[in-house]
UniProtKB/Swiss-Prot annotation:
SUPFAM superfamilies: YcfA/nrd intein domain. This is Putative UPF0401 protein YpjI. Belongs to the UPF0401 family. InterPro entries: DUF905 (IPR009253), YkfF-like_sf (IPR038612).
Length: 90
């Protein structure tokens, strides 16, 4: 699956989730799209934070699932850097 195909699948699935979606609801699309640089951290039951890390493990973007403009920074990162879909540990 290419980066753009993985992102399209991930974005379509997430766009259908309610704002209060659980970490399990968010994790499924990440795993099925083969996306490895986006992680779920700070799972608080109904609120989760998505974290994007670069190849060295440094955080480059983060947002809570309830933030109204959370996707804006994420889209900038995706357009600039793409999405890692390898499965190698960092």
């Amino acid at each position: 699956m290419s980066n753009s195909e993985g992102w399209x699948s991930f974005x379509q699935t997430l766009s259908g989730l309610p704002q209060w979606a659980s970490a399990d609801c968010v994790a499924g699309p990440l795993v099925s799209a083969g996306i490895t640089d986006i992680n779920i951290e700070d799972d608080q039951g109904i609120h989760v934070r998505l974290i994007v890390r670069d190849a060295e493990g440094r955080m480059v973007w983060r947002a809570w699932n309830f933030e109204p403009d959370a996707g804006e920074g994420f889209n900038r990162y995706i357009h600039r850097s793409g999405i890692r879909t390898d499965t190698f540990p960092r």
